[in-house]
C-alpha cells in the first residue's frame, strides 16, 4: 500500500497494487464507481482543503508503483 499524491499534495488515502483505495482517516476502503462510458474504476478523493477530485484507479496505481 502506498500513499496517494494528487497535484503534489499528500493525502490521507492509500492505494494497493490491485487498485483498492483506503482512507486512513476513517480506516475504511472506498467504494469506487465504474464509468459507464469507458468502464474504468474511479474514486472521488477529498483533498486537504476540502476540494474533491475524481481519480481513476489505474492512474493512481501507476503513479504510486511505477516510480
Q: Where would I find each of the regions flagged by the language model?
A:
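Conserved recognition-core residues within compact binding domains
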Residues: 1-67
